[in-house]
A protein has these predicted regions:
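A residue-level signal for conserved active-site and pocket-lining positions in enzyme catalytic cores
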Residues: 16, 53, 77, 104, ...
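Short glycine-rich anion-binding loops that position phosphate/pyrophosphate groups of nucleotides
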Residues: 57-59, 108-112
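Surface-exposed, charge/polar-rich loops and edge strands
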Residues: 1-7, 22, 94, 98-103, ...
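Charged helix-capping and loop-helix junction motifs
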Residues: 119-125
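Glycine-rich, N-terminal phosphate-binding loop of Rossmann-like dinucleotide-binding domains
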Residues: 55, 107, 167
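A structured binding-face within diverse protein domains that lines the active/interaction site
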Residues: 89, 106-109
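N-terminal active-site beta-alpha-beta segment that forms phosphate/nucleotide-binding
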Residues: 2-99
Length: 183
């Protein structure tokens, strides 16, 4: 039966948010540590020295340990201002306005075509659309369980450049293809 694309996305969103919320604390901790290791091994994909990330909620993969590691390595880390699109402020610093070179985005579900499904508000799609022409790199982070073979896509949906899970790094466009995790 043909479904309205918005309804189909809503159903997928609900399904994958439930999958994400059901991940236990010990696996979540493992995934956060694996994310740090994969980032360390693949820092050549990171553009510039200023990286924006997010504060996890709703079962999102915990990027706070990664943010701490990036600070330790000398990167400037920023978080988006949810009240003002395209504004970022320093994290663990003076909260000054920052312009990131690389943006780490949360993901509800992703596919092999580098499509991401988020909460449905279009916030990250708008950000990607506005900042990609400026050469910014967009990295989606998720649990491998959030993989969906083919996501429904609308005209406004924006693709990611890289997707990192606890298991591997997937690179799109002109970037090298899938890099397996090394321990």
């Amino acid at each position: 039966m043909f479904k309205d694309i918005k309804q189909h996305k809503k159903e997928i969103r609900e399904q994958y948010r439930t999958i994400r919320k059901d991940i236990d604390e010990s696996y979540s901790s493992y995934a956060a540590n694996s994310l740090i290791n994969l980032f360390n091994q693949n820092l050549s994909y990171v553009k510039g020295k200023t990286i924006a990330a997010y504060i996890p909620m709703d079962g999102e993969i915990n990027v706070v340990p990664l943010m701490c590691r990036l600070l330790y390595l000398g990167y400037k880390v920023a978080i988006p201002d949810k009240n003002q699109l395209l504004r970022f402020e320093g994290w663990n610093e003076t909260n000054e306005d920052v312009i990131p070179d690389t943006i780490i985005t949360p993901v509800v579900a992703f596919d092999d075509h580098f499509n991401r499904l988020g909460f449905g508000g279009g916030w990250y799609d708008t950000m990607i659309e506005k900042l990609r022409p400026l050469g910014k790199i967009f990295i989606g982070v998720a649990y491998e369980k959030q993989y969906c073979k083919n996501l429904p896509v609308e005209k406004h949906d924006q693709k990611l450049d890289i997707i990192i899970t606890e298991m591997c790094v997937r690179c799109g466009g002109g970037l090298p293809k899938k890099a397996d995790r090394k321990e």
